[in-house]
Amino acid sequence: MRFDSVTFDLDGTMLDTVADLAEACRLMLEDVGAPPRSLAEIHSFVGKGMAVLVERCLTREHPPTAEQMHAAIESFKHHYTETNGRFAQIYPGVLEGLKAWKASGVKMGVVTNKPGMFTEALLERMGMSDYFDVIVSGDTTANKKPHPEPILHACEIFGVRPDRNLHIGD
């Protein structure tokens, strides 16, 4: 079957960004006076967006208050702006795959739960931004993945029927 477009998840699919996230979480937890988390814990918290990551890092016996969440999210944003892409690794075979898809003429996009302020900067820092025609971040649509809205939005921008799009993600 031939597809007219292909969309890719970012974290955990094309890039291993856990070390970036872990460093930002470490610094955020330090800022707010919370106990540290292990890399394995942070890895298990990733995938539902920044606010969920921060909340999971803060939650021990009781969930954080709204004030604690606000302070922690602001701290995380500050630190992640600095660590975003610093330790990230492109998974083996990803660049070769992107080159092949691009050469085939298929429209390509990124659909991620990562906030837009971090998505584009990360793609630039990793030298990957030129491969993509569309970027749908976690704050582009009202709903995040796994809701279909972000992928449907990418298809709409492409001008492609959803059944003609292939999504690759973890």
Residue ranges and their predicted role:
Residues 1-44:
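Active-site neighborhood of HAD-like aspartate-dependent phosphohydrolases
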Residues 2-4, 78-110, 116-120, 148, ...:
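Short, acidic loop-to-helix structural element flanking the phosphoryl-transfer center
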Residues 7, 14, 90, 108-111, ...:
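Conserved SAM-binding loop
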Residues 22, 26, 39, 43, ...:
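An amphipathic alpha-helix signature
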Residues 48-82, 92-95, 100:
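A metal-dependent, Asp-based hydrolase signature
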Residues 86-89, 115-168:
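Substrate-recognition "cap/lid" segment bordering the active-site pocket of phosphatases
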